């Protein structure tokens, strides 16, 4: 019985520390913004000055944690592009983005690796067939100036 309790406490502590670390990577402003965006859909509209014709310009969809999971850009003829995002449950950081064209076909898949301090480390760019296209490495240089 004692072993079970100590494992449970250890597991709970580990989960608590992981959540605390993930939350500490976000600034208070970022946390407040996420809170305001929970389960939100934002539609942006444009209006032609001469004809007063109105059309949908952009849609952003946020999940129950306030993270943008889909963004769609429109033109007068319809969808220009769309991006969907997936997030790591532990850190809350985006781990994958899929870009779609005006015909709603995937054109690029981006997968991300993050440094322990919450900054991007690498971005892997894949073609729709799954073939690795390129790798972007992020370098952060701080100056004393």
Locations of the language-model features?
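Buried hydrophobic residues that stabilize the cores of well-folded domains
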Residues: 23-145
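Positively charged n-region of N-terminal signal peptides that target proteins for export
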Residues: 1-4
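Short amphipathic alpha-helical "recognition" segments used for binding
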Residues: 6-7, 120
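Bacterial N-terminal signal peptides
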Residues: 8-18
């Amino acid at each position: 019985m004692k072993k079970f309790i100590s494992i449970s406490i250890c597991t709970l502590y580990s989960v608590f520390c992981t959540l605390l670390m993930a939350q500490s990577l976000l600034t208070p402003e970022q946390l407040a913004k996420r809170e305001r965006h929970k389960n939100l859909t934002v539609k942006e509209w444009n209006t032609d000055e001469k004809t007063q014709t109105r059309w949908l310009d952009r849609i952003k969809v946020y999940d129950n944690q306030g993270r943008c999971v889909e963004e769609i850009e429109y033109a007068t003829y319809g969808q220009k592009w769309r991006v969907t995002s997936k997030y790591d449950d532990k850190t809350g950081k985006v781990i994958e983005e899929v870009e779609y064209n005006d015909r709603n076909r995937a054109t690029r898949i981006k997968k991300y690796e993050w440094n322990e301090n919450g900054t991007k480390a690498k971005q892997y760019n894949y073609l729709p067939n799954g073939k690795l296209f390129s790798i972007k490495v992020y370098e952060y240089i701080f100056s004393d100036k």
